[in-house]
Amino acid sequence: MDSEKIAQTLVELRGARPRAEVATALGVSVSALAMYETGDRIPRDETKRKIAQYYEKTVEEIFYA
């Protein structure tokens, strides 16, 4: 699992959506989402599933591609 690649994917998926909007939808703090998007933290499995569902992708597509 390459944290830089995951971070880049998450930023690309979020696009122009405000970080606060996505964080609220996922049930995480804005700072946690920011850490995922900078590669400073990898989300837990449950959060990975929420992220995948939100972006209509699979966990594998986002985190293991």
Residue ranges and their predicted role:
Residues 16-38:
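Short alpha-helical DNA-recognition segment
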